[in-house]
């Protein structure tokens, strides 16, 4: 079975970090976003991985080739015109066998093995409070009756979570071709939801399955919230002599921590250096350097340097000092 993972988006809401690093390669709680996704996908033992790349694809390609031992194919999406458009670029490789589609920008948890074994087309869903931000499904019993992209008037609270199993690849490829070649756009893009709706209207049964864990990584605040949620599962407390570690945290073995207070909710990636600082609720990326700073709710990008200046204070009893 094949797994198709579109990762061509520019991640504009995560700038400046995505100016130089693909969104899928951003670090959160010890791993990149794409590594979390691959961990879930490994359960179905794919025969081939197809990545649809575009923006900064030259950085993603070697990274993925090192991570995956099975055959990997890369397809270029020249313009980011929607998920249906992305899949249309890979249509020649999708016609024959059932496959999974997993969007490359959201960390999730689901029993994919059960879905694949059942063999019925299915969409991963999760109940949300505000469905206007998502594509949603409307059910008739267990089957999908209608799909709507980001409805302004509430029609369902079952949000599409970016994971799909397709049992009839030929029908999906034909439906995507109708959307793209017929210039059917919703909100300015060629949407996968429109292609899936065509499949439903053609009489194809599509069911849903629950996404147990769903962690948004679309903007800085969401990335930090995901970091907090994933760190809550980390039981080990790393030790760094001369520093105070307040769990939960994740610190790579190669990260250097000197005379600092780290945590809670901090991840420090490989090669990071944190010296004479207080850091909480933050992500410090690979080979980043933080010195003489108080950080909270911050993301320090790969190889970035954030440096303050040491201060000598003489503070009396019952006083309060805030360092900005």
PLM features per residue range, with description:
Residues 14, 60-64, 172, 176, ...:
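Hydrophobic packing residues within well-ordered alpha-helices of enzyme cores
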Residues 178-324:
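Left-handed beta-helix
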Residues 2-5, 13, 26-27, 31-103, ...:
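Conserved N-terminal catalytic core of the sugar/cofactor nucleotidyltransferase
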Residues 50-54, 125, 283, 299:
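Short internal beta-strands
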Residues 10, 105-106:
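Active-site metal-binding loops of divalent metal-dependent hydrolases
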Residues 11-16, 132:
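Short N-terminal binding/cap micro-motifs at the start of the first secondary-structure element
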Residues 25, 137-139, 208:
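A structural signal for short hydrophobic beta-strand segments in well-ordered beta-sheet cores
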Residues 107-183:
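Conserved core of the sugar-phosphate nucleotidyltransferase
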């Amino acid at each position: 079975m094949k797994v198709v993972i579109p990762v061509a988006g520019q991640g504009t809401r995560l700038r400046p970090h995505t100016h130089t690093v693909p969104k899928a390669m951003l670090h959160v709680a010890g791993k990149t976003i794409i590594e979390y996704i691959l961990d879930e996908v490994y359960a179905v033992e794919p025969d081939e991985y197809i990545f649809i790349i575009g923006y900064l694809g030259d950085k993603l390609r070697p990274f993925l080739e090192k991570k995956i031992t099975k055959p990997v194919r890369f397809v270029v999406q020249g313009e980011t015109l929607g998920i249906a458009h992305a899949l249309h670029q890979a249509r020649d490789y999708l016609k024959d066998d059932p496959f999974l589609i997993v969007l490359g920008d959201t960390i999730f948890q689901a029993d994919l093995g059960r879905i694949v074994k059942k063999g019925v087309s299915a969409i991963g869903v999760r109940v949300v409070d505000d469905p206007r931000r998502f594509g949603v499904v409307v059910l008739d019993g267990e089957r999908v009756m209608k799909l709507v992209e980001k409805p302004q008037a509430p029609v369902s609270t079952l949000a599409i979570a970016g994971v799909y199993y397709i049992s009839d690849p030929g029908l999906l490829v034909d439906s995507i071709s109708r959307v793209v070649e017929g210039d059917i756009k919703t909100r300015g893009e060629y949407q996968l939801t429109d292609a899936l709706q065509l499949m439903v209207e053609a009489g194809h049964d599509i069911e849903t399955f629950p996404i147990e864990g769903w962690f948004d990584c679309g903007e800085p605040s969401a990335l930090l919230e995901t970091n907090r949620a994933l760190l809550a599962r980390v039981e080990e407390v790393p030790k760094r002599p001369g520093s105070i570690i307040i769990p939960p945290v994740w610190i790579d073995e190669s990260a250097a921590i000197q005379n600092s207070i780290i945590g809670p909710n901090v991840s420090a990636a490989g090669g990071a250096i944190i010296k004479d600082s207080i850091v909480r609720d933050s992500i410090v990326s690979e080979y980043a350097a933080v010195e003489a700073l108080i950080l909270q709710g911050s993301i320090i990008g790969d190889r970035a340097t954030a440096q303050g200046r040491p201060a000598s204070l003489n503070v009396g009893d019952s006083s309060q000092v805030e360092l900005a």
